[in-house]
Amino acid sequence: MVCMHETTSERFDFRTAMEGYAKAGIRAVEPSLVKVREFAQKESAAAARRLLDDLGLKAMSSSNQVGLPEPGDARARSLEDLKWKCELAQAIGCDRIVAPSAGTGQYTEDDYKRGADNLREAADIARPFGVRIMLEFTRTSRFAASLPTALRLVREANHSNVRVMMDTYHFWAGISKFEDLDLLRDGELHHLHFEDVPADPPREILGQPNRVFPGEGITPLGRIVEVLKRKRYAGAASLEMFNPAIQAMDPYQAAVRARAAIEPLIR
């Protein structure tokens, strides 16, 4: 199932993005909780849920909360923000939130023991809302930049509300290896961000805006999908783009383009 991550339409408000996605035949979305809050402050969280329901949209995931796994001075603030985000996620019928690792410190092995504890603490906050914390490894993180490390942290946390997710951009442009997919247990992957890595610029200077639509780059997305299906992943493929030109594209047009790019790869 093709899913639209609201970051792909960053220049638009919640209603405009959701209406454009629905018009394009999208049924799965990954709302930005900041955008949902802006909408709710003018109307209500219940109105946001009604909008999704009326459009035939399901919030498959929500975005996001940084600063949860790695030790750091900002963690207390991250945990406070997590509370309102989980409450809002629950209000729009969403049962999961992305927790990217964006650590920039110099970490030790003991920090990874604390990382598992940190994920458990975050999950205890999320559990009363029926929300799961999904650890996302990111290519620039100094703490969790690869699938093996993310799996280690999630497994050591050993909490029913802590799961692992993957972004194909971070996977292929980062330090993970294709063979790392074999480490996944059946049904272990909880969510998927689905984009391509361009041949240029060199990976050493790649940035988030360099992401391209699936099929336009060098990532072996077809092979990745084959492995994930074998690993019993049956969730959505969510397009998360940071290119300012794409973020300014009419949400309907962005969603039409997403479907054309992704659907042939995930059939």
Residue locations for each model-derived region?
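N-terminal-biased segments
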Residues: M1-D13, Y21, S32-V34, E38-A45, ...
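Histidine-acidic metal/acid-base catalytic patches
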Residues: M1-G25, G56, G93, A144-M166, ...
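Active-site-proximal loop/turn and secondary-structure-junction residues that shape catalytic pockets
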Residues: T8-E10, L33-K35, Q65-L68, S101-G105, ...
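Active-site acidic/histidine proton-transfer and metal-coordination neighborhood
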Residues: R15-T16, L51-L55, E70-V164, A173
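Conserved beta-strand positions in the central sheet of alpha/beta enzyme cores
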Residues: E30, S61-S63, V98, M134, ...
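Glycine-rich, proline-tolerant flexible connector loops at the mouths of alpha/beta enzymes
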Residues: E30-L52, S101-Y107
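Vicinal oxygen chelate
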Residues: F39, Q65, A102, I205-N210
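Short, solvent-exposed loop/turn segments at secondary-structure boundaries
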Residues: A40-E43, P71-A76, T108-K113, I175-F178, ...
